[in-house]
């Protein structure tokens, strides 16, 4: 098949981003007949023969787009910041879709006086998956920290003495409260953005641009 005639590929992750992307696609007249939560397929067709979806880990979406395995993708700001810190290639981010909204926060045990520790100049151990965002946040505030990278179960770290604080995504705060933690500081608001491979935009722009425009219109109507 002529690469220029091949379907466009949109990289998505399972879960909240996939679920909140579906209304945007529907608004653009595109339906996805299979749900990745119930299907084992990693490549999903759509009602538009010119577009297919690939299902990857959230942290891998920017990599698939950067290297051209996907023409475009949808990823959270948190993921994009961490990706940019590790990769030299830049991704075109034409639209903040305002989906999968949450906050990146500093959280501690409810009995830990975070403000007092900061005021006293204590060096804090901070566990997080979002190393770059955490490092930039504490550097800007002049707080001395040692960053410990974890990949999951972040709430456990302060409870077992691994860390004084965590930096993690928070939606309702229910998981923090259930584990005796409290958010004490916002790092940044998070939402998901449309990202596009820059080479594809040049070589397949006539097909990509209408889809980008459709996402923009859909996000504005649904917002």
From Swiss-Prot:
Source organism of the structure: Bordetella pertussis (strain Tohama I / ATCC BAA-589 / NCTC 13251)
EC numbers: 2.4.2.17
GO cellular component terms, A-Z: cytoplasm
Record-given protein name: ATP phosphoribosyltransferase
PANTHER family noted in UniProt: ATP PHOSPHORIBOSYLTRANSFERASE (PTHR21403:SF8), ATP PHOSPHORIBOSYLTRANSFERASE ATP-PRTASE (PTHR21403)
Notes concerning its domains: Lacks the C-terminal regulatory region which is replaced by HisZ.
CDD domains: PBP2_HisGs
Catalysed reactions, semicolon-separated: 1-(5-phospho-beta-D-ribosyl)-ATP + diphosphate = 5-phospho-alpha-D-ribose 1-diphosphate + ATP
Family in the record: Belongs to the ATP phosphoribosyltransferase family. Short subfamily.
EC category name: transferase
A single GO molecular function term of this UniProt record: ATP binding
Keywords: Amino-acid biosynthesis, ATP-binding, Cytoplasm, Glycosyltransferase, Histidine biosynthesis, Nucleotide-binding, Transferase
Disulfide feature: none
Entry-linked InterPro entries: ATP_PRibTrfase_cat (IPR013820), ATP_PRibTrfase_CS (IPR018198), ATP_PRibTrfase_HisG (IPR001348), ATP_PRibTrfase_HisG_short (IPR024893)
Subcellular location(s) per record: Cytoplasm
Function: Catalyzes the condensation of ATP and 5-phosphoribose 1-diphosphate to form N'-(5'-phosphoribosyl)-ATP (PR-ATP). Has a crucial role in the pathway because the rate of histidine biosynthesis seems to be controlled primarily by regulation of HisG enzymatic activity.
């Amino acid at each position: 098949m002529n690469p220029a005639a091949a379907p466009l590929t949109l990289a998505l992750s399972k879960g909240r981003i996939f679920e909140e992307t579906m209304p945007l696609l529907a608004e653009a007249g595109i339906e996805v007949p299979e749900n990745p939560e119930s299907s084992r397929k990693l490549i999903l067709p759509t009602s538009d023969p010119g577009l297919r979806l690939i299902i990857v880990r959230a942290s891998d979406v920017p990599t698939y787009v950067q290297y051209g395995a996907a023409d475009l993708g949808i990823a959270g700001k948190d993921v994009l910041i961490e990706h940019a810190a590790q990769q030299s290639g830049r991704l075109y981010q034409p639209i903040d879709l305002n989906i999968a909204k949450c906050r990146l926060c500093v959280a501690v045990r409810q009995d830990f006086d975070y403000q007092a520790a900061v005021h006293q100049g204590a060096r804090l151990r901070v566990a997080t998956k979002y190393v770059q965002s955490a490092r930039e946040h504490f550097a800007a505030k002049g707080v001395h920290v040692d960053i410990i990278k974890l990949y999951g179960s972040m709430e456990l770290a302060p409870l077992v003495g691994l860390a004084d604080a965590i930096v993690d995504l928070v939606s309702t705060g229910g998981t923090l409260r259930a584990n005796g933690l409290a958010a004490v500081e916002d790092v940044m608001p998070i939402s998901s953005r449309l990202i596009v491979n820059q080479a594809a935009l040049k070589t397949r722009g006539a097909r990509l641009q209408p889809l980008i425009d459709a996402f923009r219109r859909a996000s504005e109507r649904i917002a």
